[in-house]
Each structure stands twice: as structure tokens, then as C-alpha cells.
A protein has these predicted regions:
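A short beta-strand-turn-helix
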Residues: 461-481, 552
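Conserved segment of the thioredoxin-like fold in thiol-based oxidoreductases
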Residues: 495, 504-546
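Active-site region of glycoside hydrolase catalytic domains
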Residues: 2-56, 60-61, 103-105, 113-372, ...
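Conserved redox-active cysteine motifs that mediate thiol-disulfide chemistry
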Residues: 485-502
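Catalytic domains of carbohydrate-active enzymes, especially glycoside hydrolases
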Residues: 76-97, 300
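Hydrophobic beta-strand anchors of alpha/beta hydrolase catalytic cores
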Residues: 482-483, 515
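Thiol/disulfide oxidoreductase modules built on the thioredoxin-like
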Residues: 532-537, 543-591
Length: 594
């Protein structure tokens, strides 16, 4: 790493963040956590923490706030689902409160289980997909008293709980996260001491991190082995906060930035990717982690991203580094800068795992609501840029649906798309939330009529050939696929098709390239006569209702277009009409894939 290594910052004066497009099947959602919104969660580790004092006999929570009734989401979830509908989102990420479900060891509350079943069913009834987090910073008091994840043997209790909740919600929840942000849980609870259990013990922090990651692996394989386990996606949610040198010329700043990035981000990612890693900070902790089963313990990875921090190194053993803000940065109420470029960086970092990515949290605290519109536009632009660069992102969840109890910050931080008056529980949509709503509901065609974009995963469908043979597009993974949308009444198609025959079909048909013509809105006999008239031999498929066409483009748009899909199922090139330069560029794109 060099002192001249460029800082990733974009010139926003030259960028139009509204000029973006997301795939039609992209998941849009909001997120909450049980303790922050449900209310009356008084049997978990955070309840104890809120009512305790620090070493100076001061409240551990800003303004001595208590979660208390919170946003009363437990009783008001039906109304909150209506708010989600108003936003236009189709996914909702929330956590189940372990302490409600298993208030005593081995004793399960049927009423609590039924509540979560009814919540999931009501979401589905409103065409909103439930996304469940099993552990979002809280667990029962009895588990805390046993030592929680400080002891390896305690993981069996969390695995047992996970099995129970899976069996209860099976068939209702297709996407599951085991843990929310283990790195934050460890950093705040065992390094900084501002989350429960309030310890400052780097060695114990390494143990807890290892035990949580191993518990994730156990839960993944356990749930996958159960009936119905093969139908769900299971992942873990990883927070990334980049640590960048405050002074790019300073060796200490670089060194401590690297150490922090390694222990906070790279170590757990390497464990999940390779099954082994090291939790290491010089002079503080050096814990080797190994579990071969971790290598295949993810169907997806969740990314929570907010910002970055600048690190200043010091020649001081008591305080070897501190965090500093730059004067030019626009700051959120949480004290970190607006840094959309970091979302792009984080997506590239986490893509090393080779699994689909969901941005499971992204948002800001902004009491004035003045920064929120710019924040949303820029971060969604960064997300779209990652998609264009072929990073496999499947969805985005804004944090949060509504204002909530923000852990050690209490009720001071206003993250919600909806403002909450905690005296009356009235929810009011913030004006600054509009860019998010507009993007969620924007997903129509682009200027050329396409509903998909380069970098998207190609929508799957059944190909029905004129020969009567059928196969699914997904089954063609491993080959380059060129879809040519056509129709007998399309004069441009008739001109283009002989060129496709010569330049693609005859040249590459035995080299791993599938050229498939998709004829829209016409019966078999018309399609067969059409193929005979133009003199082509590459296979044609039937699309009588233009349903396949409608997966890729607005049905009211022109038919002449080609879609090039790589061996992994990603769209890499799109054409419209038959323009010579674009056509040659398409041929070059196909050749580059071979």
C-alpha cells in the first residue's frame, strides 16, 4: 500500500445521481430491529443495560433514555405494513426477539411465536416478503447470565432457538440472517464497552467473534438439513466501516487503518470465504479461527453500510490511534460523514465471497431532514454503479422504516423514513424520504425501452422452441447466450437476422455460444414461415403473449433488440435496432467472453 494510493472520492458536480436504473426484480425494502421498535422488551440484555450505570454512576444511554414502548410496533405492525405499502417496497427486514420467544431456558411462548407468524402472513398478504434476522444485538437475560457467546458451549442454545423459529415460520420466510453485525456487537461490547456487557477485553473479543461466526456456521448447516431448508436462503449481515488514513502521507495513519480494517472487516470475511482467519491487533489480541464448514455456509451476504472513519496514529501506547473528521465533510447526526463512494467500495470488498449481496441497512440520522435527499440519491447512485460493474447485488433495505431507539444514542437519532412522535406514536412521512420512494417506484423502462440493464442478472424463463423442445434460461449457465427479439412484421429484424446467422451462429455455435431468436406475439406456423423466408437456421422460440419480451423491455417498445448474457447469467450487452457500430461492439463483446 502506497502513500500515493488514491482516495476514492467522486466529483459529484459532474454526476447526475438520478440517471440510474435498477432491475425489475431488484428487492426494495426497509429494515427495523425488535428491541428498537417493538416496545416492552424487558427480558433481554439491553433492558438490563439501560437500567444500569457506568463507572461514574451515569446512565449508559444518552439522555437516560429507555427503550420502553419504543415505536409500539408489536401492536401497530398492521398500520406500519400500510406505511410500507405506501412507500412501494416489496421486502421487510426485521428481527425476532429471542427473549419473547424463549423467556426461560427451554420454555417457548406460543403467543410470541403466533405473533411473528401473523406478522409474516400479513406481510405476504400485502405482497411484501419477510426477511428475518435471528439475532440483532439482543438475547434473553438467562443467556446473558450463562456468559452468552463468551463461551463456546452456549452456542447450542442459540442453534436450538433458531431451529424452533425456523420450524414455526417455515414456508413464510424465504430469506434468513443468523446475526446482525457481529463486528459491531464485538467492537462495542468488548472493545469500547458502550454496548452490553460493557467489557474492554480484546482477547475476550476475539473469542466472542469466533464463537458467533461458528454459531452462524452451525445454524446454516442445521437449518439446511431440516425439511424445507433447501428452499430458503441463509446468510449473515456484515457491517463495513472503512478506516482510512487521516493523513495520507503518515505511516502510522496507514498502519492503524490497516490493522482496524483487518480485524473489523477482512478477518470475518476471510473466515467465511476460506474457513480460517486470524483476529489480530498488534499487542492486543491474536486469535486464530478455523472451521472448514464455514466455506459453504452462505447463500447470500448482507451488507450494512453507512460511512467511513479517518484514523490518526500516535506514538502513545495508551492511545495509539484516534478518529478525526475532515473540515470539508458533510456530517450526519451520528458524527460520521456522508460518503456514498464507500458503499461502492464496500460492495467490491464483500463481493470476494462470491455470493449474492443484499444491502441490508443503509441510511442516516438527520433531524433537520436537510441532508437526507442528497444522501439517498448519492448512495443509490453508488449502488447502481456497483451493479453496472457487475457486482451481484440483489436488493437494498433502507434503515429505517421509522424513528426508533438507537441503542446507546437513545431516541436522539432520527433515522426513519417516517418521523415518529413517541408521545402519540403518530407516524409522518419525512419530505426528505421522497427520493427513495421515487426510485422504488421508478422502475419502468429506460429511454430505449429496456427494463434491464448491463450488470443485471438475466430474468429466468422457459424457452419453448418451434421444435417443441423446452429448457430454462437458467439451465444454460456455462454458455454465452444471445437473445434476439424478433417478429415477422419487423422489417429491421429481417435485415439483421442474416447477419446474426453469419456473424454469431455459424461462427460460434460450436464454441459455447447459444443464439436464440425469441419471436413475440405470433403463432407457430407464422414463426416457421418467417424463419424460412429470412433463410436462417438458428433456433427460434415462441413468445405468444410477449411475456418473455416483457421481462427485458416494455411491451409497448420496439421489438428489434439483442441481449448478450455471459456464462454466469449476467447481462453484458444490450442493443436496439440494427446500428452498425453498436452491432460491431456487440460482436466484440461476445468474442471477449470466449
Amino acid at each position: 500500500m502506497s502513500f500515493s494510493y488514491p482516495d476514492t472520492e467522486w466529483d459529484w458536480e459532474t454526476i447526475d445521481p438520478s440517471d440510474i436504473h435498477f432491475p425489475r426484480d431488484f428487492a426494495w425494502g426497509t429494515a427495523t430491529a425488535a428491541h428498537q421498535v417493538e416496545g416492552n422488551n424487558d427480558n433481554n440484555n439491553w433492558h438490563l443495560w439501560e437500567y444500569s450505570k457506568d463507572e461514574n454512576n451515569l446512565s449508559r444511554i444518552h439522555n437516560s433514555d429507555k427503550s420502553g414502548l419504543a415505536a409500539d410496533h408489536w401492536n401497530r405492525y398492521s398500520d406500519d405494513i400500510k406505511l410500507m405499502k405506501d412507500l412501494g417496497v416489496d421486502h421487510y427486514r426485521f428481527s425476532v426477539e429471542w427473549s419473547r420467544i424463549e423467556p426461560q431456558l427451554g420454555v417457548y411462548d406460543s403467543t410470541a411465536l403466533q405473533h411473528y407468524k401473523e406478522l409474516c402472513q400479513e406481510l405476504l398478504d400485502n405482497n411484501i416478503t419477510p426477511v428475518v434476522t435471528l439475532h440483532h444485538f439482543t438475547h434473553p437475560i438467562w443467556f446473558e447470565k450463562l456468559g452468552a457467546f463468551e463461551k463456546e458451549e452456549n452456542s447450542k442454545y442459540f442453534v436450538a432457538f433458531s431451529k424452533i423459529i425456523f420450524e414455526e415460520l417455515k414456508g413464510l420466510v424465504p430469506i434468513w440472517s443468523t446475526f446482525n453485525e457481529p463486528s459491531v456487537f464485538v467492537a462495542q461490547g468488548y472493545f469500547n464497552g458502550i454496548f452490553p456487557p460493557g467489557k474492554k477485553d480484546p482477547i475476550l473479543a476475539g473469542t466472542v467473534m469466533e464463537n458467533m461466526l461458528n454459531a452462524h456456521v452451525q445454524i446454516y448447516h442445521k437449518l439446511k438439513s431440516l425439511p424445507g431448508g433447501d428452499t430458503i436462503k441463509i446468510g449473515i449481515v456484515k457491517n463495513i466501516f472503512q478506516f482510512d488514513p487521516y493523513r495520507r502521507w503518515n505511516l502510522l495513519d496507514w498502519a492503524f487503518s490497516k490493522f482496524l480494517n483487518d480485524v473489523y472487516t477482512n478477518s470475518p470475511l476471510k473466515f467465511l470465504k476460506d474457513g480460517q482467519s486470524s483476529f489480530y491487533l498488534p499487542g492486543m489480541v491474536d486469535n486464530d479461527m478455523s472451521n472448514p464448514k464455514a466455506v459453504r455456509s452462505l447463500d447470500f451476504i448482507g451488507l450494512n453500510y453507512y460511512s467511513r472513519m479517518h484514523v490518526k496514529g500516535h506514538l502513545n501506547s495508551r492511545e495509539p490511534f484516534t478518529f478525526a473528521n475532515r473540515e470539508q465533510d458533510v456530517m450526519t447526526d451520528m458524527g460520521y460523514p456522508v460518503y456514498a463512494e464507500g458503499l461502492y467500495r464496500a460492495l467490491k470488498t464483500i463481493s470476494i465471497l462470491g455470493v449474492p449481496i443484499y444491502v441490508t441497512e443503509n441510511g442516516l440520522a438527520d433531524d433537520t431532514d436537510e441532508i437526507r435527499p442528497t444522501f439517498i440519491k448519492r448512495y443509490l447512485y453508488a449502488l447502481n454503479r456497483a451493479l453496472r460493474d457487475r457486482i451481484d447485488v440483489r436488493g437494498y433495505f433502507y434503515w429505517s422504516l421509522m424513528d426508533n431507539f438507537e441503542w446507546a444514542e437513545g431516541y436522539k437519532m432520527k433515522f426513519g423514513l417516517y418521523d415518529v412522535d413517541f408521545e402519540t406514536q403518530k407516524r409522518v412521512l419525512r419530505e426528505g424520504s421522497m427520493p427513495f420512494i421515487e426510485m422504488v417506484n421508478k422502475q419502468g423502462a429506460d429511454k430505449r425501452g429496456y427494463l434491464v440493464d448491463i450488470g443485471d442478472m438475466a430474468p429466468d424463463f422457459t424457452i419453448r422452441y418451434t421444435s417443441g423442445k423446452e429448457e430454462r434460461l437458467h439451465d444454460l449457465r456455462g454458455e454465452v447466450v444471445v437473445l434476439q427479439f424478433t417478429a415477422s412484421w419487423c422489417s429491421v429484424c429481417r435485415i439483421e437476422m442474416p447477419h446474426l446467422e453469419k456473424d454469431i451462429w455459424e461462427k460460434y455455435k460450436d464454441k459455447g455460444v447459444r443464439l436464440i431468436g425469441v419471436d413475440r406475439d405470433e403463432p407457430l406456423e407464422t414463426v416457421l414461415q418467417f424463419q424460412k423466408d429470412v433463410g436462417t437456421t438458428y433456433p427460434l422460440a415462441l413468445d405468444p403473449g410477449a411475456d418473455i419480451f416483457g421481462l427485458f423491455a416494455d411491451k409497448n417498445s420496439g421489438v428489434t433488440r439483442n441481449v448478450v448474457i455471459d456464462r454466469d447469467g449476467k447481462i453484458v450487452f444490450l442493443t436496439r435496432l440494427f446500428e452498425e457500430k453498436e452491432y460491431q461492439d456487440m460482436l466484440a463483446s461476445i468474442a471477449s467472453l470466449l
